[in-house]
């Protein structure tokens, strides 16, 4: 009782917020000038020893575009929204390791699986990544604590250790199966309504938009045990505002990242960016406060022994694992992460299944062989659906949700493939390019889920490198919600393929990807969902 009383007192003081804690030096070089150490990037051997060890090269010896050329690529050639394609362009010209400089920071870009492995295996106890300064500026301006995505060091470790509970392990994620299936049932009902209202009686004109609503409904139900009306014909205004604000925040973040600070009063992007973050946090705070009020009402009605700890936030609050300020700083970020992974990945998966009917038919056969039509899949069923898991893996290979990540090794100098980098060098991990490397994935541009299935011992076409595709990251800073995201995607995709044949709408054409921090379709994805007999 004393613990819960202290919790109520701390939440009463929530409105008193605390402040958060508190282009290349070398010109462009021809591909022929790529250092031999870079051309030999396939080697994963450690540093040499003895007198035969070659001289380690320095950061200044790396190739890369000059500052002006990099700016030209971003703004005049339009790569600011296609940074993943710019990675491929620069890798083709400079090799798997090159520098780019923007402002005062020089980044080292890594675009091969062995190079990613060399960096990620040197992370240490507290992996450091890009500081996301624009996110921090909003938190500082509003007096908000930093959330899980922008904290570093021991503070990050404390948050991550607390949030891991009831989230990270597969058995813990499986506890949310019934909640997810409830939301998915409502989603399918909403999808049926949308398709029957179309002119053809089976078309969904914007699949990503509908899946975004599903993902937001699901993550809010998991975090707060509350439905937010995303799947209703008329969405509540605060929920609709949140959905709009997330999309606009990501869109404007591209510009506020690359435009100089002196341009902020002159251009609209910064003001929009800040306002959208305000809306995101307003929604998150409302959800948190409602949960606190619900817990207090249960205490008054039944006493401390009569309150059953059930959901994720309820558990964290009762155990006092996070302070009120940490909760407000972190949970809006968790909502964002829970939405983008599932909605974008499922959109791409359905798009490619519609383009590959033979794969879709094989998947339908697998799903209905385990869960016949009319039955609802459960977590245990997916152990018998290897192709379903392979479809999701292949989709994430082609479209990693976040096409780049970064690491900064602060404790020591870092030796990578014959180069010695000083402490605090920022390494940009080019996941999009690495996962389309033909030396790791034959025919890398094609959608081939079967490449992930177990093969004969004499078949060499399988995965050749464990870091070839790491869409959820690696190590202690890997994706917190990976298990829940995978479960949600498996549950939904199996039920959709069980019930519908998915085909491209007439005139749909090819869909490319755009990078707005996360990788999204370049246009609306319109699909037909044909009822299976």
Swiss-Prot record:
Pathway: Hormone biosynthesis; cholecalciferol biosynthesis; Steroid metabolism; cholesterol degradation; Lipid metabolism; bile acid biosynthesis
Chief site of localization: mitochondrion
Assembly behavior: Interacts with HSP70; this interaction is required for initial targeting to mitochondria.
Record's protein name: Sterol 26-hydroxylase, mitochondrial
Record organism: Rattus norvegicus (Rat)
Cellular component GO terms, alphabetical: mitochondrial inner membrane; mitochondrion
Any Pfam family matching the protein: p450
Modified residue annotations for N6-acetyllysine: 142, 375, 512, 523
């Amino acid at each position: 009782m004393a613990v819960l009383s202290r919790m109520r007192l701390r939440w009463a003081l929530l409105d008193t917020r605390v402040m958060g804690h508190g282009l290349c030096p070398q010109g462009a070089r021809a591909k022929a000038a790529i250092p031999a150490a870079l051309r030999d990037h396939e080697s994963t051997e450690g540093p040499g020893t003895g007198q035969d060890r070659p001289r380690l090269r320095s950061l200044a010896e790396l190739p890369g575009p000059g500052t002006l050329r990099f700016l030209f690529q971003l703004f005049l050639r339009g790569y600011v929204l296609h940074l993943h394609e710019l990675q491929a362009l620069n890798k083709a010209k400079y090799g798997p390791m090159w520098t780019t400089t923007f402002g005062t920071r020089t980044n080292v870009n890594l675009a091969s699986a062995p190079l990613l492995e060399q960096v990620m295996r040197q992370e240490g106890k507290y992996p450091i990544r890009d500081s996301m300064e624009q996110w921090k500026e909003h938190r500082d301006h509003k007096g908000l604590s930093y959330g899980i995505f922008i904290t570093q060091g021991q503070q990050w470790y404390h948050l991550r250790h607390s949030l891991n509970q009831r989230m990270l392990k597969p058995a813990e994620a499986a506890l949310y199966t019934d909640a997810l299936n409830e939301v998915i049932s409502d989603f399918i009902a909403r999808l049926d309504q949308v398709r029957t209202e179309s002119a053809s009686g089976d078309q969904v004109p914007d699949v990503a938009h509908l899946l975004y609503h599903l993902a937001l409904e699901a993550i809010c139900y998991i975090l707060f045990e509350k439905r937010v009306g995303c799947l209703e014909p008329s969405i509540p205004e605060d929920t609709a505002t949140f959905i709009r604000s997330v999309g606009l925040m990501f869109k404007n973040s591209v510009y506020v990242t690359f435009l100089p600070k002196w341009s902020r009063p002159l251009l609209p992007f910064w003001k929009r960016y800040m306002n959208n973050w305000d809306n995101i946090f307003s929604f998150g705070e409302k959800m948190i406060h409602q949960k606190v009020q619900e817990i207090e009402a249960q205490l008054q009605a039944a006493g401390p022994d009569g309150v059953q700890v059930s959901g994720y936030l309820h558990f964290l609050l009762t155990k006092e694992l996070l302070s009120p300020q940490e909760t407000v700083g972190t949970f809006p970020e968790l909502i964002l992460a829970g939405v983008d992974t599932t909605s974008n990945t499922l959109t791409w998966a359905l798009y490619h299944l519609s383009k590959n009917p033979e794969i879709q038919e094989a998947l339908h056969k697998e799903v209905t062989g385990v869960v016949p039509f009319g039955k609802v899949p459960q977590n245990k069923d997916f152990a018998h659906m290897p192709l379903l898991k392979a479809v999701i893996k292949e989709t994430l290979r082609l479209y990693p949700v976040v096409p780049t990540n970064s690491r900064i090794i602060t404790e020591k100098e870092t030796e990578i493939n014959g180069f010695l980098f000083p402490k605090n060098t920022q390494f940009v991990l080019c996941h999009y390019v690495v996962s389309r490397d033909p030396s790791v994935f034959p025919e890398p541009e094609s959608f081939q889920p079967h490449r992930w299935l177990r093969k004969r011992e004499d078949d060499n076409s399988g995965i050749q490198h464990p870091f070839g595709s790491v869409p959820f990251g690696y190590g202690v800073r890997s994706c917190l919600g990976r298990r829940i995201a995978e479960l949600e995607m498996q549950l939904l995709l199996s039920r959709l393929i069980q019930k519908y044949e998915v085909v491209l709408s007439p005139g749909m054409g090819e869909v490319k990807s755009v990078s707005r921090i996360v990788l999204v379709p370049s246009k609306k994805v319109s699909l037909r969902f044909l009822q299976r007999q």
